[in-house]
Amino acid sequence: NKYFGGEDEINKKRSEWAKKHLVVLAEGDKKKPTLTVIDRGEGQSPERIQNSIVHLSGSIKRNVDFVFGKYHQGGSAAIRFCGSKAKCYQLVLSRRAETIADKSKPNDYGWTLVRRNYKSRTAFYEYCTDRDGNTFSFKFEKPLKIDGIDIEFADGCLIRLYDYYLDNP
């Protein structure tokens, strides 16, 4: 290809891009590992997490073609394969990308723990907030080191799925 190189060159560029922007880690038990997915996309600020990443019934994703949640492939689709009825958890950690963050506010990390609750006839999802109903947050001082490996998380979104059921690992 005149502008992008041949197929090998295009695949090499895609691979290099993916290494920088998308990470999938598995640890623990082979049939029920803890999976960590890091997407170094735009991320969300703590005050936006409740209306975006963990929001199930809103229309925020309807007009955005590239988000998984629009196609029911986001976090709520994955959590049903986590753990057991007694413990079904997913960690959400996010920080807005510096290039699009609101410069008038601190650009902190936000986090919550999501669980699928089976205490009624119909299971439902719920997530943790502080006592005022806000998403938990902490100051950004430097990128977080992930599990002692050579990966740093500065912004984007990290989803950790605990005891994820893999039928055929």
Please name every model-derived segment.
Residues 26-28, 39-44, 57-60, 77-82, ...:
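Short, flexible loop/turn elements at secondary-structure junctions
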Residues 1-40:
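ATP-lid-like helix-loop hinge signature
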Residues 66-169:
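GHKL-type ATPase core
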